Amino acid sequence: LWVSIENEEKDDDDDPDNWWYYFGSNGKAYKRSDSASNDVSLKTINGKKYTFDEEGKMQFGWVADGERQTDDDAWQNCDYYFGDENDGAMTVGWREIHIVDENYEGSQPNDDIWDEDQDRWFWFKSSGKKQTDSVNKNINGKKYGFDEYGRMIAEWYTETTYVDKDTT
């Protein structure tokens, strides 16, 4: 049973108006166990995977160490993305996500890819972990590239091979 409870501690725009909780058939809220040692502690509900904190609040957006991350660089430091505040299901497959890249190099004016505020595509494996550092990742028969933070490389990319002139 899903229950939405007003967030009485909301103090900034990153906080949700309501927190979602899930109560199992035993009447207890799903919570992250104190012994959870991995980045996220997953619970499957109606075929979708969710993560909750120690208080039972459904986590959403970028999540690391069992907690929601709201810093502008969360997309760089986190491996898992759990939808928005009303559907915190773990993302698997393609997802376009709005990010803020404070280290962008604005070399192309009026280009969305080179703007600090960006909508970028990410690929999340079946484990929910984002794909990173891959130039020739085969997904559904097509090849894609991803940078060290998991953004799909949206520009033209040419792989260069060097030959040592002394070996010919």
Describe the role of every protein-language-model region:
Residues 1-168:
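Extracellular adhesion/carbohydrate-binding repeat motifs centered on closely spaced tryptophans
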